[in-house]
Amino acid sequence: KFFKMVFSRAGIFVILILIQLLVFLGIPYYLKEYATFIYSAMSVMEIVVLVYIINTEGNPAFKMTWMLCVMALPVIGTVFYIYVHLQLETRFVQNRLAALRMETEPYMDQDEKVTEALWASKSANAQLSYYLSHQLGFPTYRNTEVEYFPVGEDKFASMIKELEKAEKFIFLEILKRKVNEGVEVRFMYDGMCAFDLLPYSYPKKLQKFGIKCKMSNKIRPFVSTIQNNRDHRKICVIDGQTGYVGGVNLADEYINEKERFGHWKDTAVLLRGDAVQSLTMIFLQMWDVDMRGVEPYGKYLTKKAESLNDRLGYVIPYADSPFDHENVGEEVYFHILNHAKKYVHIMTPYLILDNEMLTTLIRAAKSGIEVIIIMPHIPDKWYAFAVAKTYYKELIEGGVQIYEYAPGFVHAKVFVSDDDTATVGSINLDFRSLYLHFENGVFIYDNPEVQKVEEDFQNTLAKCHKVTVTEVRNRGVFMKVAGQVLRLVAPLM
C-alpha cells in the first residue's frame, strides 16, 4: 500500500515538489564557504523585496503573508518570492485572457434601454451594472427567466431534462449519445480532478466518443503560482438558450447519492433567455486560453428577444479571474452589503475573511441591517473550519448572526437581500475564491425567483443551530489553537 501511494500520480507529484524545495534549501549549504557574502547580499535583497511587497498593488493580507515568509525564512522566502513572481506562464494566461475579452466584446454589448430602465428602478444597482459592463464586459439583461434550485438533486434532474432537448451544442461534461445525434458537446474540468479523481488520459477517452474535452490548468510537478489558480466555475450552456450556474459539481455527494458530511446542501439557478449569451462567452473564453486562434463565436449565439418582459427583472451573469486585477465576486458581495435596507442573508461553506469584508459585514449589522450567515455544522475541511471559527466571536459581538446547518454540510454560495436582490454562484467567502480562483455567478434583481431564494434561506435556517459567544469561547483547545495559528496563512487557504 505504501509503494502504491508513493508511485501514484499524487505521490510522484509531491516527491518532485519536495526535490525542488530541497534544491532551494541546499544551495546555501553547499555554498557555505561564501556564506558571508551570500548572506550580506541576501539581507540587501530581503530589504528590497520587503519594500517592493509593501508598494505593490493588492490585498494587504496577502502582502502580510509574504512579508512574514520573507522575514521568517530570509533566504528561502526571498528566493521563493522572486521565483514565483517572474513566471512567464502566468503572464501568458493573463495576456491571453485579455485578448480573448477583446475578441468576445462585440458579442457582449450592453443594451442601453435596459440600463436606462435600471437607473429608473434602482440607481445603486445601475451603478453595479455600469461597473460590470464597462470595466469587465458583463452586460445587464432582461428577458431572462430564472429558476432557483434549493438542492443539487433538483438542479441535476432539471439539467438532465434540458440536455435531452439539445439540438445544436452543449457546453458541459456530458453526453455520448447526444454526440451521435449530431449535437456538439464540450466538457471542460479543472486539472485538480486528475490529481486523484480522474485518469490523466480522460480527455482522450471522451474525445474517442466525439466529445470535445479539455482539462483546464493541468497540475504539473513544478513549483508554480498558477497552480493555485483553479477553475472553480460551474457552467452548463445548452443551445445558447439555457444555462446553469451555482455551486453544484458533477459528483454523487452533490445530489446526496453518496453521504460524506451529512446532508449536502447546495444551490443553483437556471437561466433561460438573453442572459445565457454571457455564459456562452464566459465558457468559450476559458476554453480558448490555450488555443492560438479564436472561435467563430457568432455561430453559438441566439437571437435576442425584441420585446422587453418587465416581470423578469434584471439578470447579470458575471465571472471572476485572478489575472484582471478586479475582485468581481467580492465587489458584488460588497455591493449587496452596502446597499441593503432590511437584511442580507448569506450561505457559504467557508468563512476566511480579509479585514475589509469583516468590517463590511459588521458595519452592515451595526447599521441595523439583519445580517445572518449560515455555515456548515459538519465541515469538509477541518482546518478551514478551525480558521472560520476564529472570526465568529468578532462577528457575533458586532451584531452578525451565525448559524450552523445541523443536518450536515452547506456548499451553497448565496447572498439574498431585501426580497429583491440575490446572487448565486461558485464564489465562497474565502481568500481562494475571492482572489485566486476562476469563479462565476449571476446577479439577480427584481425577479420573482428572489423570493424563492429567501424562502429557501428561511427553510434552511429552521434546520440550523445558532452559534453563541459562549459556545465559541468553550470550543476545544486544539481547534482554538489550530485556528489561531492557521490564520497566519489564511490567504493561502
Residue ranges and their predicted role:
Residues 1-330, 335, 339, 363, ...:
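N-terminal localization/anchoring segments of enzymes in phospholipid and broader phosphate metabolism
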Residues 188, 347, 374:
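Generic enzyme active-site microenvironment
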Residues 340, 350-372, 376, 381:
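Helical hairpin unit composed of two closely spaced alpha helices linked by a short loop
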